């Protein structure tokens, strides 16, 4: 059965643990966290809030944390993330970790060395700066190097759309083994920009995307990798849209809780000058 999540990191003064309470109150069933919002400094607070919710963990990337697992000169930061996952992963209910192929001056041997230190399954995400064929080559190399630790691959729809265009953004689903597709990232984007917008704020044909992955029988993890743009409420509506497509019961649950909690949440956000 599909597990539907939402990316969480600090937002306008709200910590990850505060946002976790927010999405739990709305009935969200899963979240994806990252080092930008989850560290050794606040992990105990997050654990106290997570309850039975299942989480995934996005390993650091240069665009957010300023480094990734393929950089030898970032050993201290990388080891902190490894320690976080290995020591607290079970208490965080972590299912898997998401990794990008090497960026910039990154080295794939360093990436492999660091990934092997993690006590958690790994999925490899397609990115804009690699062609489908290059991504497949790296994926197959990691399958050899990591063995069963590499659980599968992740399809980031916006990344593929920006790289391959309107006609070919779904081609990767036929190039790599669909049975090994373990996670999908959804968000809207602008032309030439990986915007992480809510659905409808950019150029992606989200209805077509949802229809395609449902018709293919996809039944694993979907994460809305969406920032609060245009508004927090658009993020919630995007989550409801995915739930309505794949899990009607979850859609009804979130819709009902939104009707009850929206005035309370709105008042708290206004009090903190967030909206």
Predicted features and spans:
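Short, basic, helix/turn surface patches
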Residues: 54-66, 127-128, 152-154, 252
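Short, contiguous strand/loop micro-motifs
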Residues: 6-7, 68-72, 126, 196-197
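Hydrophobic, well-structured mid-protein blocks that either form specific transmembrane helices
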Residues: 100-143
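Structural motif corresponding to the early beta-alpha repeats
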Residues: 2, 29, 33-109, 159, ...
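Active-site beta-loop-alpha junctions enriched in small/polar residues
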Residues: 7-11, 34-38, 60-64, 102-104, ...
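Histidine-acidic metal/acid-base catalytic patches
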Residues: 1-5, 13-24, 78-86, 90, ...
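Conserved N-terminal beta1-alpha1 strand-loop-helix module at the mouth
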Residues: 6, 11-43
